[in-house]
Amino acid sequence: MSLKNEDQNDLSPKDSVKGNDQYRAPSGIHLEPEEESRNDFWQFEPSNLFRHPRIHLEPQEKSDNNFKKFVIKKLEKSCQCSSTKAKNTIFGFLPVLQWLPKYDLKKNILGDVMSGLIVGILLVPQSIAYSLLAGQEPIYGLYTSFFASLIYFILGTSRHISVGIFGILCLMIGEVVDRELYIAGYDTVHAASNESSLVNQISDKTCDRSCYAIIVGSTVTFVAGVYQVAMGFFQVGFVSVYLSDALLGGFVTGASFTILTSQVKYLLGLSLPRSAGVGSLITTWLHVFRNIRKTNICDLITSLLCLLVLLPTKELNERFKSKLKAPIPVELFVIVAATLASHFGKLNEKYGTSIAGHIPTGFMPPKAPDWNLIPRVAVDAIAIAIIGFAITVSLSEMFAKKHGYTVKANQEMYAIGFCNIIPSFFHCFTTSAALAKTLVKESTGCQTQVSGVMTALVLLLVLLVIAPLFFSLQKSVLGVITIVNLRGALCKFKDLPQMWRISRMDTVIWFVTMLSSALISTEIGLLTGVCFSMFCVILRTQKPKASLLGLVEDSEVFESMSAYKNLQAKSGIKIFRFVAPLYYVNKEYFKSVLYKKTLNPVLVKAAQRKAAKRKIKRETVTPSGIQDEVSVQLSHDPLEFHTIVIDCSAIQFLDTAGIHTLKEVRRDYEAVGIQVLLAQCNPSVRDSLARGEYCKKDEENLLFYSIYEAMTFAEDSQNQKERHIPNGPNFSSD
């Protein structure tokens, strides 16, 4: 029977389906929603069914899966050496050698220079501000952004992303630094004051607080970079797929609350110890309210003035970004104005405001990470590495797709890994791509990675010449800059209604991750989000949608009878769809919902046995004196159907428990005279059934490539039975 396009049935989807199927009808078929539940399954019996021959497909020849041969083949391929392979390996690891010789100077240079300069100008104040978040001196933030920009220029494959400091990673680094400083016996309250000096910070016997802080930060950065390079080498970038958009969004928002909380003390001019560990957000607010009377009025006024300037200007930049050739570098203007006001007004001497202090020029001698610290920070570096590469890879792929080019995910992991490993020897902390700066970079005309070189040149100018001029800059200004840059993450709450309409499960994941990241800790929040997301995936497959199917008139299409009306149910056959993999988690639910929608063969068999026993008690003897044998199969009323067709199109895979469940279901139904047919099994499911010996050699005809084929087979086989049985059983409903 072919699908008729000229005279289609007037059917439409059900208005409100609570139900049992997530499939929708194919295009060209209109299904009318069902208004009332259908209690009578057998209301339609189409006639003149077209009988077509069985479909037989010849499987492809399978490749040899011998593990030993596979390993030997891979080793032979890896150990082969030629000039071409060496060239490809070098060019693959250093993408700059591929694209730089082809650089179109006339076409790209203007956009790259403009975007690089603008991002560099924006990075200067953010690098200084985020250094406080990471528990470091301002100079180290400038080092970090400088080296990251240069290294990604050499190793990166994305033309648009901006790699440098990222607030969430700075927060995570800062928590580790504070913990190790406390263990080492440094006075964090005293260290939060203005007594910061980088002169002669390393001696033969001692290392001051700022020295030890960057040692911890660079060690964590080194370990995180090693993890990221290892992920690229072993090609385990798939780990990032477990960080869904909802999970990452909730994590960033929750961590943003922690960042905001950590900056409040700078806005108020309070000298408070930085809380770390579980419940740090609540602990910090308790410290703030207990010391609110000690607020430095000068810092408070400065913070309010900076907020009044930064917030409106940032909103104007966002609203008119399509009309502005470049965003207004308001942060740089604020820093310059605040530094001048603090210097000439002598705010530190008169009012005791907290200032950035001495920022040296030039570069410090390289220093290796502290190998003795690695065992203590190895676990902390795992979350930092995963978050860093997940954000970098996702942003690079997003902008590559937008601009029509490709990036290599594994090479991106190498790039971000070495952006952490190499700078860790030069007093730097962890970096990754950042969305806000990437958007600025793209909108200002960035064409290639050359833009990163221009950004590095701006930072180099600051490091060599301008940095000491920020001596009088108030830390409250840096705190305001950090908080204002969180507005994007904190404004995600306005997207929740739309997220709720699209997916309630994703919204719950977002809330759970956000609350755990904010109220417990960032690391535990990330772990909680991942575990809860995986639990939600299991939950979705534990009790999935299941329904009985009916035939769309004048077609070979079957759809859910609970979702659509005017579907035709064939007498004597029930078609069951299960929308999930069949495995150990949902095997019992599969049986229960199948029995509920058809019949429970175990109960039917028990009823048959009881009826047989009663009949045996009333046994009769034939006139010839020979006792009749009581047939169990004829000792009960005929069942209303003879065949169950299980639609396996939505069953992605089977495990051992799933195969045993199908065997058990088939055995139970056959015991009461009902045959079970499987239809639309994908090749993976067919292979699992073959390995699990679901069918014997003479039973392979019980697997069908379409539901309609299975239904036709069931009708034909039943008709043959009825021809051999006078007054055969009636399979119509009462």
Swiss-Prot record:
Its main location: membrane. PROSITE patterns: SLC26A (PS01130), STAS (PS50801). Residues 563-714 form the STAS domain. Residues 1-18 have a biased composition (Basic and acidic residues). It is a multi-pass membrane protein. Residues 1-38 are annotated as: Disordered. The gene is SLC26A2. This is Sulfate transporter. GO terms for molecular function: bicarbonate transmembrane transporter activity; chloride transmembrane transporter activity; oxalate transmembrane transporter activity; secondary active sulfate transmembrane transporter activity; sulfate transmembrane transporter activity.
